[in-house]
Structures are given as structure tokens and as C-alpha cells.
């Protein structure tokens, strides 16, 4: 109960799927370079650079080989998606991001999540939630969006359009020098902003 959902990337659709089925458990949303994917708004239908890359390597048969080695390639993959602030990278930082991927079996989610978009496999589950869940209850929650404008995975204009369709009066914060991983690019700005939002709601 009273969950503050703070989500980024795939956290948005996961948060949307959870909250539309259990809105009584959720108090507020903090979205960062993601979308709940329930607003029905799509400002840019062109594939992002990341999903063009996914399509290229899936069609060439090389995707599993690259994403299956995230234990050693995670930084390179994050740079493709939109990680801008390389000054944050230390050995501890690399160890933290590499640790979840000690072997190829551990990379299955990282391989399958982008393929869910590429093959549009997730759409039915989202639509089922919209049809059977309580979208009005979700829309009544306090929400904020933080969006790095150098995101190469999710078009910022799509994240903003989806958010505004659901939460038209909620704050949208954009950051021209941050990318998809805004929590890594601008933590000194983002953390106080989130604390302030929680205190106000």
C-alpha cells in the first residue's frame, strides 16, 4: 500500500501493467525516460536509434551474441541507448552494472525485452489491462516525469505525449544534456526533484 513507483525504461510499462490492475496499492508515480504505455498518444512513430539497432542485429542473427555478453559489454550497450555522463564511470560503477549478467542465461531479459517491442509482443497484455483495469484510478494519482532529451531508446516526445495524455496537469521536467539513463546523467538534479515531489504529494 501507498507505493511510490519510481521507474525508468521497462519500469514504465511494468508499472503501468501493475498499477492498472492494483491501483489501490499505488500512491504516486515518478517516471524517468519511460512511459506507462496507456495514454494512447504517439508523437513519433519512427523507430528510435536503439530499436533500429535491435532490428539490424536481430535480422543479422547477431543480437543474442552481443546482448548475451552484457557482463563485459554493458557500458557499450548503455552508450547506444543514451548514457551521456561518462565521468560517472568507475570500477565500482561498472561492477554494479555488470554484476546482474555473469553468464549468457542471465542476459535473457535484456535480450527479450527489446524484442518484445520489435515484435510487438507486449501490446496484448497492455491492452488487456486498459480494458479490464481501472485506468481512471491510475490517472487520479500524483505523477511526475523526468525526461533526458538525448534518449536514443524511447523518443522523448513519445514519453511526454503518453504522460500528458494520462496526467495533463502533472509536472514534466526535461533535461537537454541527459539521455535515457537520466538517473546516471543528472542524479544531483534528479534526486532533490524526486524528494520535493514526494513531500508535496
Map each language-model feature to its residues.
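Flexible "cap/lid" subdomain of the alpha/beta-hydrolase fold that forms the substrate-access gate
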Residues: 1-6, 10-174, 183
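Catalytic active-site module of serine/aspartate enzymes centered on a nucleophile-bearing elbow/loop
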Residues: 168-201
Amino acid at each position: 500500500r501507498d507505493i511510490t513507483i519510481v521507474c525508468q525504461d521497462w519500469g514504465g510499462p511494468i508499472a503501468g501493467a501493475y498499477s492498472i490492475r492494483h491501483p489501490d496499492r499505488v500512491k504516486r508515480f515518478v517516471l524517468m525516460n519511460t512511459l506507462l504505455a496507456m495514454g494512447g498518444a504517439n508523437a513519433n512513430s519512427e523507430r528510435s536509434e536503439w530499436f533500429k539497432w535491435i532490428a539490424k542485429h536481430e535480422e543479422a542473427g547477431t543480437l543474442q551474441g552481443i546482448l548475451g555478453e552484457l557482463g563485459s559489454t554493458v557500458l557499450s550497450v548503455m552508450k547506444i541507448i543514451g548514457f551521456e555522463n561518462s565521468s560517472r564511470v568507475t570500477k565500482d560503477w561498472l561492477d554494479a552494472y555488470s554484476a546482474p549478467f555473469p553468464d549468457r542465461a542471465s542476459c535473457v531479459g535484456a535480450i527479450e525485452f527489446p524484442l518484445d517491442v520489435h515484435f510487438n509482443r507486449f501490446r496484448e497484455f497492455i491492452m488487456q489491462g486498459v480494458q479490464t483495469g481501472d485506468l481512471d484510478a491510475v490517472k487520479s494519482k500524483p505523477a511526475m516525469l523526468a525526461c533526458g532529451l538525448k534518449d536514443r531508446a524511447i523518443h522523448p516526445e513519445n514519453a511526454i505525449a503518453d504522460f500528458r495524455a494520462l496526467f495533463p496537469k502533472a509536472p514534466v521536467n526535461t533535461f537537454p544534456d541527459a539521455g535515457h539513463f537520466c538517473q546516471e546523467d543528472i542524479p544531483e538534479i534528479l534526486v532533490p526533484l524526486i524528494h520535493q515531489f514526494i513531500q508535496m504529494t
